[in-house]
Amino acid sequence: MSSDDLSLYFNEIVNNVNFRIKNFVKSNFKTLEEASFHLFTAGGKRLRPLVLVSSSDLIGGDRERAYKAAAAVEILHNFTLVHDDIMDNDGLRRGLPTVHVKWGEPMAILAGDYLHAKAFEALNEALKGLDGNTFYKAFSIFITSIEIISEGQAMDMSFENRLDVTEEEYIQMIKGKTAMLFSCSAALGGIINKANDDVVKKLTEYGLNLGISFQIVDDILGIIGDEKELGKPIYSDIREGKKTILVIKTLSEATEDEKKILVSTLGNKEAKKEDLERASEIIRKHSLQYAYDLAKKYSDLAIENLREIPVSNKTAEKALKYLAQFTIQRRK
């Protein structure tokens, strides 16, 4: 299969999911609808919908159900982004002003709440006509995902005032904050098509490993990425005091003088550009390659998970492998 064929496959999924998102995210109150739909207008990679629909296709699943379930996870994802931007006080997302910057915090909180409700509405529509056990499994993993995402975000925030965060704690945090929704997406692709427990387990593991790899690369791009390409400020993780794998590794490897520079910049809202750049240089020196190698390890694990699933659709298999590889090759 050529890259053009895979691109057509992905575009078909994205267009169909976008159409359903637009139909779900409607409100009688215009301002609420605009604020809720704002981040969708800026595009986004739609990786979670691609994972869900490709996972469904992999086992010969129902496309219409998959599109609606994919809309549910993407709406849920955007809900978390709206609230994350408030918590992190970020002014840009995907090159656009964040919802709280454009409409104010009260409306942004309401928009997040509205998206949260709409995500459940979309999932409910996806599950219509299915038996009670399947309905229960799908809603259980969706609800559990929200709980674990919240716990992951809470862990991330709690790390900001610590310098002793371990790699194990970091991995646990990103499993919750980021990887859980990828895992949920892949699992739902199996659950809505009544896949057996072994298949759902392997899809779950695929999504989890892909999500861990994705977040590690996200943290890397926050240090070395291009601001215009990313659509958000670089160095914001340093300014916010985030304990990414790069910071954790650097603190364990750097000289005492380098540590002093890094610690004085971490979490310093008043840090100047040259301070942030110096801290970035120290991080690149000590942890950039390590972080890339770690991301590749989890990307490889995701691909390995796919080898244990009976395949009904070769295109979907290639798509899922590509998505795992894309996580470590992307520039935004």
Swiss-Prot record:
Sites where the protein binds Mg(2+) 1: D84, D88
GO terms, biological process: geranylgeranyl diphosphate biosynthetic process; isoprenoid biosynthetic process
InterPro entries recorded: GGPP_synthase, Isoprenoid_synthase_dom_sf, Polyprenyl_synt, Polyprenyl_synt_CS
Annotated binding of an all-trans-polyprenyl diphosphate, by residue: R93, K177, T178, Q215, K232, K242
Pathway note: Isoprenoid biosynthesis; geranylgeranyl diphosphate biosynthesis; geranylgeranyl diphosphate from farnesyl diphosphate and isopentenyl diphosphate: step 1/1
Binding site for Mg(2+) 2: D84, D88
Cofactor section: Mg(2+)
GO molecular function terms noted in the UniProt entry: geranylgeranyl diphosphate synthase activity; metal ion binding; prenyltransferase activity
The EC number(s) this enzyme carries: 2.5.1.29
Domain of life: Archaea
Keywords: Lipid biosynthesis, Lipid metabolism, Magnesium, Metal-binding, Transferase
UniProt remark on cofactor binding: Binds 2 Mg(2+) ions per subunit.
CDD domains documented for this protein: Trans_IPPS_HT
Top EC category: transferase
Reaction(s) this enzyme catalyzes, per UniProt: isopentenyl diphosphate + (2E,6E)-farnesyl diphosphate = (2E,6E,10E)-geranylgeranyl diphosphate + diphosphate
Positions with a binding annotation for isopentenyl diphosphate: K45, R48, H77, R94
NCBIfam families membership: GGPP_syn (NF041003)
Entry function: Catalyzes the condensation of isopentenyl pyrophosphate with the allylic pyrophosphates to yield geranylgeranyl diphosphate (GGPP) which is a precursor of the ether-linked lipids.
Family: Belongs to the FPP/GGPP synthase family.
Full protein name: Geranylgeranyl diphosphate synthase
Organismal lineage: Archaea, Thermoproteota, Thermoprotei, Sulfolobales, Sulfolobaceae
